[in-house]
Every structure is written in C-alpha cells, then in structure tokens.
C-alpha cells in the first residue's frame, strides 16, 4: 500500500456526532505516548508530540480518497483527571458501537514493557466489542536485537494474544515494520473486495 494522499477530514470531541462514512476505517489505539502519531506520521498523517495525552479527540484522516485512518485518544495519561478519562472512555466506546465501517483495530503497545493494566483492559475491551486487534509493538529501536524475541513473547503472553493473533514489531526511527503494517491493511481490503 502506497499512501499518495492523506488529510485530516473530521475531528470528533466528546459531544460530537460521528460521521456516517461509507469508506473503510482503520483504527489506531494505544496508551498515551506509545507512538500512535509517530506510526501514522510516516506520511505526515498526524502531528507528533513528546507531550503525552495530546490526542484528545477522535481524528479521521482520509487516505488515498478511499479509506480512513482513525486515531483514538491515548489512554492511561496520568495527568488527565478521572472525569476526563471517563469521558474519553465513553467517547471511544460510542465510536466502537456506532461505526459500521471499522475493518481493523491496531493496538499499539510499547515492546519494552510488559503490557500494563490499561493495555490489557483496552485489548479485552476491543475483543469484547467483537474485534481481534492487531498488535503493533512500538519502540523496537530501543531494544538490542537479542532482546526482541523475549519481549515479543512477554507482550503476547501479557495480553493473552491467541497463537494466530498478529503482532508486528515497529520502529518509527528505523521504519522497520512500517511496510508490514501497510501490507496488512492492503491485504485486508483486497480480501474484502474479492468477497
């Protein structure tokens, strides 16, 4: 998949009505500062920030005029108050229940650490809502090559990822894993078109 064109089309806050899109939606979820925006920014899709909790809305990016990348607010941001976190949670839940165009949910997890409580809750929540998330294990460049297999195993086991569950190690610095992510999306949409 080659991204030729991408632009921010819709921004939805807590009280917003979600757009009634007809094109497929590819969703990106993850803890604050895990690298969601960095992954999407491979083609200038989203602004990046070193400040966690920056994405506080659901952002729809129109890609190649035929699909959307949907960026969900980062969860687990320590400086957000409880009321704000609850509002974000309700907004995400409303989106998952409302959208009829979700084709895939990518859940980004920091490969350097065992999945935390919020990661596990988000994974279970996505599964409960009828989706099997694809795990993108970010910050790959922070590991030595000899550590990767062990860390991948820890992430898989920490989430309870099934044997056939997809996990893609990714680095925004070296671009490793980027093509696998885009190829996964391309194959998914191609399978859908052939049905």
Which residue ranges define each predicted feature?
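Charged, alpha-helix-enriched surfaces in structured cytosolic catalytic cores
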Residues: 34, 83-87, 117, 150, ...
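Switch II of P-loop NTPase G domains
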Residues: 18-21, 50-59, 73-103, 111-125
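Conserved nucleotide-binding/hydrolysis micro-motifs of P-loop NTPases
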Residues: 54, 67, 74-77, 112-114, ...
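Canonical P-loop GTPase G-domain recognition
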Residues: 3-16, 142-195
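Hydrophobic/anchoring residues in structured secondary elements
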Residues: 50, 107, 169-172
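Conserved C-terminal guanine-recognition region of P-loop GTPase G domains, centered on the G4
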Residues: 90-165
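Conserved G1/Walker A P-loop phosphate-binding module
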Residues: 1-79, 190-191, 195
């Amino acid at each position: 998949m080659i991204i030729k064109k991408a632009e921010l089309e819709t921004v939805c806050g807590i009280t917003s009505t979600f757009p009634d899109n007809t094109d497929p939606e590819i969703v990106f979820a993850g803890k604050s500062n895990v690298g969601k925006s960095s992954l999407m920014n491979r083609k200038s899709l989203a602004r990046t920030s070193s400040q966690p909790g920056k994405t506080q809305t659901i952002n729809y990016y129109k890609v190649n005029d035929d699909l959307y990348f949907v960026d969900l607010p980062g969860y687990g941001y320590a400086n957000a108050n409880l009321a704000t976190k609850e509002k974000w949670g309700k907004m995400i839940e409303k989106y998952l229940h409302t959208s009829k165009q979700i084709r895939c949910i990518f859940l980004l997890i920091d490969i350097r650490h065992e999945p935390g409580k919020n990661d596990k809750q988000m994974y279970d929540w996505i599964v409960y809502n009828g989706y099997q998330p694809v795990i993108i294990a970010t910050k790959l460049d922070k590991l030595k090559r000899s550590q990767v297999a062990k860390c991948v195993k820890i992430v898989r086991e920490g989430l309870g990822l099934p044997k056939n569950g997809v996990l893609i190690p990714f680095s925004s610095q070296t671009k490793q894993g980027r093509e696998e992510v885009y190829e996964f999306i391309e194959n998914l949409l191609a399978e859908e078109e052939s049905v």
